[in-house]
UniProtKB/Swiss-Prot annotation:
InterPro entries: ARM-like, ARM-type_fold, Armadillo, RING-Ubox_PUB, Ubox_domain, Znf_RING/FYVE/PHD. Functions as an E3 ubiquitin ligase. This is U-box domain-containing protein 4. It catalyses: S-ubiquitinyl-[E2 ubiquitin-conjugating enzyme]-L-cysteine + [acceptor protein]-L-lysine = [E2 ubiquitin-conjugating enzyme]-L-cysteine + N(6)-ubiquitinyl-[acceptor protein]-L-lysine. Keywords: Coiled coil, Phosphoprotein, Repeat, Transferase, Ubl conjugation pathway. It holds the Pfam family U-box. Residues 172-204 form a coiled coil.
């Protein structure tokens, strides 16, 4: 009891903490405080009296001590820029437990057969019990759970729900929302380092919710009443106001100087828009954008706002405004028209005679009903047509909100506590894999940006795979799996002033466009297992026994043997070598045709783990594994298909296997998995198709199998596969069939988005694809220009990777030559 009292006192002393008066911490501190102030007098009496409590009561006091200590840890561990949403979910999962334990404690005291101190009369205990029971609060965690369910079902969450979440978690302004997104990314980074896959997926879902809050603010801003439409790219993502002093940060994004400076001064060294770590904090004036804005304002008689008089960063664009005026985020934002009639907007609407800054979303002709239109045809006053037949365009946000972030199946068992489905929870939480469920965690660094790479089995502690090297594009534009070339073009940089303003306009891109799997830092590879390795002779003996069991006619024996081999192959490279030399590979390949799904899953996962060793790669291919792997790809369980695709990728690292796999008919099933598989399966299929697309003969087969349509769909940031999809598309863009498919499927607008807002590697690959499209087709060249590719290409030519700069400069040079050529023929 003395320990409990010390814990209560420690918690109450937190009232002097510097963060305790911040929202939402003050609210939750008071809730815990109310519970403990009812409990403390009772605990004081028990300690000072001779009362002897029984085992049940003693256990209740122990649980209370643990709960109080947990709450202390939660409040003490919160730092500036920690996630508020994550804190709320954690504390709300603890509060009901603490409250119930206190109720149980009081009831145990009332029913105790031991003599109670006079101060603990039944009446006083009953009074305390009633106080506790009446301390009930609305739990926002249940609202968040509902929003996550709606999100996974593709029906929401609604604006009202977003407002409710924002109000109850202290996210009421644009800056608070942007900081929360960064905080959740960092929280996810920690979960990734500890390989807590369920937590990573859960945090991904929360990040999408926060992104939608930001999208809502943008939508409010863009739908404000105005007689003049303004380019969305003239708005600062931080201030949501038109920029008067635009500057470029190291990520290549442009912000209002005063706002991004204050952001950096807060200690935030992350780009608010792309979440990339800022490599330096130098702010480079963007004179081109500044001139364009000034010219536009003069043409349209619009007065620029005074940045010094702008609303405080902490009071920007309140989320609460216009709840009923903005369509649901579950609706197709990009396929609606916004009326020009006056609305009762929030206080940020213009009250002067001058037009206020806004954007009006209009329908884009030919927009696919199955995918949000990425360009919307609202013409901007003061910008006319041009020799290329350009129609200056602008539009609303990319509506990634309709698509659920369909990562590995996730559900919430309790507020703030995420888990995967019941069939897989054990393997994720305990770091173990059941016989029928083989989860893989990263064993290699991603080759496409920082997205997840085909991996070995759960808790893989092996060395990085030798094939895990960055994708880079060669001179032809094709991307290869290999070190990025350090050479860069000597093309002279040109200012945007070389281009007419006619080429500057573009439709609004997803202003908060990001990839759920984008990292703030590189993935940490697990250290070798701490378990003491057994003597190799012991492993050899065990493997020899298991190889004999693989030959058994008993399904149970085969199932158990394949499961044990899979686990052995998971642990370390020595085991893989022993198994590879034991003759097990041929038998495992044969078992890929097993009618027992568990045996088949074990066999394919064992082969995947074994293939991490390069010698085993060759042995697996020589054992005739390609066709059996295709059989699994076509007929296996979801997890077996995933691991089959990952194994095919691993084998395709060897050049001759690329040809064998392509000629064996694997491309069709891989494309089917790409379009219809699980999120994990889609990633594995995309990575396998990337390696296969390096071989020239495979490219046409990949296009003919319908891969381009699926790849373009997977460029939706919510899918977490933007970089993977762009890498494959860049290779396919080197053949005519690939270019035609990309153009026909609407890939050009999305590639331009990646150039503007993607990761460093994504920008490079997207620029390579656009270069192929533009230089080989006048029609596609015009489409690229119409999508407003020039400004992001100029930014990329100055701040991208060496090869990205080379591609961007080559494309800008081509545009310039085309324009001058057309002028000469005039």
């Amino acid at each position: 009891m003395e320990v409990l009292l010390r814990s209560i006192s420690s918690f109450l002393n937190l009232s002097s903490s510097k963060h305790i008066d911040l929202d939402p911490f003050e609210k939750y501190y008071k809730r815990v405080e109310e519970l403990l102030r009812v409990l403390k007098p009772i605990a004081d009496v028990v300690v000072t009296s001779d009362f002897v409590f029984d085992e049940k009561l003693g256990k209740a006091f122990e649980e209370l001590t643990q709960d109080v200590d947990q709450s202390i840890d939660l409040f003490r561990s919160w730092q500036a820029f920690s996630s508020k949403v994550y804190f709320v979910l954690q504390i709300e999962s603890l509060l009901p437990k603490m409250r119930d334990t206190i109720v149980d404690t009081f009831q145990f005291l009332m029913s105790s057969k031991n003599h109670l101190p006079d101060e603990l009369s039944p009446a006083s205990l009953e009074q305390c019990l009633e106080k506790i029971k009446h301390l009930s609060y609305e739990e926002i965690s249940s609202v968040i759970d509902g929003a996550l369910r709606d999100q996974r079902d593709g029906v929401g969450p609604s604006p009202e729900i977003l407002v409710k979440i924002g109000e109850n978690t202290g996210l009421r302004s644009n800056q608070e929302i942007l900081i929360e997104a960064v905080a959740l990314e960092r929280q996810k980074e920690m979960a990734e380092q500890s390989e807590n896959n369920a937590e990573v997926e859960f945090l991904d879902q929360l990040i999408v919710i926060v992104n939608r809050m930001h999208e809502r603010l943008l939508l409010i801003k863009q739908t404000q009443t105005s007689s003049v439409a303004i380019l969305a790219d003239f708005f600062c993502p931080l201030s949501l106001e038109v920029m008067t002093d635009p500057v470029i940060v190291s990520s290549g994004q442009t912000y209002e100087k005063a706002f991004i400076k204050r952001w950096i001064d807060l200690g935030l060294k992350v780009c608010p828009k792309t979440r990339q770590t800022l490599t330096h904090t130098t702010l480079i004036p963007n004179y081109t954008v500044k001139a364009l804005i000034a010219n536009w304002c003069e043409t349209n008689d619009v007065k620029l706002p005074d940045p010094n008089k702008s609303t405080s960063l902490n009071e920007l664009s309140p989320l609460l405004s216009c709840t009923d005026s903005i369509p649901s985020t579950g609706a197709d934002v990009s396929a609606r028209k916004v009326s020009n009639k006056s609305h009762d907007w929030d206080a940020s609407s213009s009250e002067t005679g001058k037009p206020s800054f806004s954007s009006r979303a209009t329908e884009r002709e030919g927009a696919s009903p199955s995918r949000p239109a990425s360009a919307l045809g609202a013409s901007s006053p003061g910008i006319s047509g041009n020799g290329y037949g350009l129609d200056a365009r602008r539009g609303s946000l990319n509506d990634f909100e309709d698509r659920s972030n369909d990562s590995r199946e996730l559900r919430t068992d309790a507020p703030g506590r995420s888990s995967v489905s019941s069939t897989t929870r054990g393997s994720v939480e305990n770091g173990q894999t059941s016989e029928n469920h083989h989860h893989r965690s990263p064993s290699a660094t991603s080759t496409v940006s920082n997205e997840e790479f085909p991996r070995a089995d759960a808790n893989e502690n092996s060395e990085e795979s030798a094939h895990a090297t960055p994708y880079s594009s060669d001179a032809s534009g094709e991307i290869r799996s290999g070190p990025l070339a350090a050479t860069t073009s000597a093309a002279t940089r040109r200012d945007l002033s070389d281009f007419s303003p006619k080429f500057m306009d573009r439709r609004t891109r997803g202003q908060f466009w990001r990839r759920p799997s984008e990292r703030l830092g590189s993935r940490i590879v697990s250290a070798p297992s701490n378990e003491t390795r057994r003597d190799l002779s012991e492993v050899e003996t065990q493997v020899k026994k298991l190889v004999e069991e693989l030959k058994s006619s008993s399904l149970d024996t085969q199932r158990q043997a394949t499961a044990e081999l899979r686990l052995l192959a998971k642990h370390n490279m020595d085991n893989r070598i022993v198994i590879g030399n034991s003759g097990a590979i041929v038998l495992l390949v044969e078992l890929l045709y097993s009618t027992d799904s568990a045996t088949q899953e074990n066999a394919v996962t064992a082969l995947l783990n074994l293939s991490i060793n390069d010698n085993n790669k060759k042995a697996i291919a020589d054992a005739g594994a390609i066709e059996p792997l295709i059989h699994v790809l076509e007929n296996g369980s979801s997890e077996a298909k995933e691991n089959s695709a990952a194994t095919l990728f691993s084998l395709s690292v060897i050049e001759e296997n690329k040809i064998k796999i392509g000629q064996s008919g694997a491309i069709g099933p891989l494309v089917d998995l790409l379009g219809n598989g699980t999120p994990r399966g889609k990633k594995d299929a995309a990575t396998a198709l990337f390696n296969l697309s390096i071989h020239q003969e495979n490219k046409a087969m990949i296009v003919q199998s319908g891969a381009v349509r699926y790849l373009i769909d997977l460029m939706d940031p919510a899918a977490g596969m933007v970089d993977k999809a762009v890498a494959v598309l860049a290779n396919l863009a080197t053949i005519p069939e690939g270019r035609n498919a990309i153009g026909q499927e609407g890939g050009i607008p999305l590639l331009v988005e990646v150039v503007e807002l993607g990761s460093a590697r994504g920008k490079e690959n997207a620029a390579a694809a656009l270069l192929q499209l533009s230089t080989n087709s006048g029609r596609f060249c015009n489409m690229v220009l119409q999508e407003g590719a020039v400004p992001p290409l100029v930014a990329l030519s100055q701040s991208g990777t060496p090869r990205a700069r080379e591609k961007a400069q080559a494309l800008l040079s081509y545009f310039r030559n085309q324009r001058h050529g057309n002028a000469g023929r005039g």
